C-alpha cells in the first residue's frame, strides 16, 4: 500500500464512531496486561509485564518527518506515538475496544455529562493533568499555553496536510488567511484549562483532535532546532528520541520522567530501516528482530502458516483502508469523466486479491467495510472490459490512448500494478508503469500536474467517514501538499459535506455521507480496488503483543520476556 499513515482495525460497527464521541472514560493512558492466546487479537502473553530490554522492529522505508504538525506517513505516526502525546488517545486494547477514546494529558474526555462539552455541542473544555513535563532536556511542566502554541503552529505550517480537519474551529480560517494573529476559538483559559469553540457542532471533532497533528510540543525546543526539529523530536511520551541514522535505524530510549507510573516496559525501541519484507521475515525467524513493521510478505504467508512454531506468532486483522487508483483530473485525458468511468470498469479487483494470497478483499465502493457509510453489497463499478471500451469510444478514444501509471516500490505494489497495467492494455490504454521510492512518490502525489494516475492508499485515522471525504475529495485538500491526489472536488459535494458535519443526528448524518458516495461514483476521480488485510508476526520473546485498531504495532504497550 502506498503513501500515508496506517490504521488497523477489526471491522468497526457503523454506530461505533458516534459511541466514541459520547464515551465518558474514567481510565487514564494505560496498557493491557496480557491474557489470551498467541495468533489471535488477544495480547501475546499471559505473563506479567516486566521492565527492561530492547525491542527491534523492521521497516522498508524511513519516516518522511517526525514533526507531528506535518507527518502523515505510516511509519511517521507509529514512531511519533511513542514520543508525543495529546489531550486524548485510544484505549490500548485490540479490536473494537481499542477504538474508544480515553484521557491522556487531559484528565477526562469532554462530554455533556461531565461538563466538558456544552449542550449545543459548540464548546469543549479540557483540563490538563498537573505535573506532566516535557522530556529532557526541556524538563518543564506542560501548560495550556503549550497546546495553543502547538495547535496554531500546526495550522500555520505551509506543509501541514490536515488543516481541513480543524477549519470548524472559530477563527481558524481568519488565522490561516493571516487576517488574525491567533485562533480565537482555541484559548488557554489558565495554565491547566483549554477551551475550544466550534462554528457548528461536529460529531467527529474529538476523534480529529486525537490525531498526532494536535500533539503538544515545546516552543523553545522547536525554535532551537528550527527546520531541523523534524529530526530532533521531543514530546511528553514514554520514549525519548536518541538518534536517527538515515537508511539504518531510529533509536528511542525510555523516558525516566514519564508521568505514568510503571510505564513504559521497554528500555529501548530500535526501528531497523531499509529491510525488505522478505529479509525482515528471515531476520525475525533467526532472532535478530522482534516484529515486522511491514507485515509478512503475501508470498510467504502459506509457508509461515503451515509451520506450527511460526503460526502461533502470526497476527492478522482487516484494515479499515482502501487501495485506490487515482486519476489526476488536471491532466488529460483524465479531465474527461467518461475516461475515468471507463477505467473504473477496466480493473479486475478479484485478480488483485489473488495476487496477494487472499490478504485483501475486493472492493467496489469508496468507503471500506467497517467505516460508517459503507453499504454492504453496493457495487458502483464492477469488472466489465466491454463497457470500458464503449466509454472510451464515447470519449473520443476508440483505439485507447497512451499514459503513465505510477506506484511505489514497496512489495507487493509493483506486481499489483503490473496487473492493473495489463487490465488497462486489454481495453486499449497503453500505460507505461514507473515505480519510485515511497517518500518520493508520496511527495510527488501532492504536486499539481505531475502524476497522471497511479496507486493510492488511504487508512483510517478515526472511525468516521469525514476522514475519507475531507482529505480525499474536498477542495481544501486539492492543493499542493494535500492528500487529494486526483485534485477533483465538487461544489455540490462541498455543500453536502458542510451540511453533514453540522448534523447532530447520527443516522441522518451517515445517510448524508452515503449519498456522497453516489455523487463521487458518478465523477469517478478514484477507482476503489481492494481492502487490505494486515498479517504480521512478533518474536516468541515479545510479551503483550497485539495489533491496535488505530496505532497498529504499538511498542509502548509491549515488553520483552
Give the location of each predicted region.
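Aromatic- and charge-enriched surface segment that lines or borders ligand/interaction sites
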Residues: 72, 108-163, 195, 283, ...
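Gly/Pro-rich hinge or "lid" segments in bacterial periplasmic/extracellular proteins
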Residues: 91-96, 172-173, 177-192, 198-264, ...
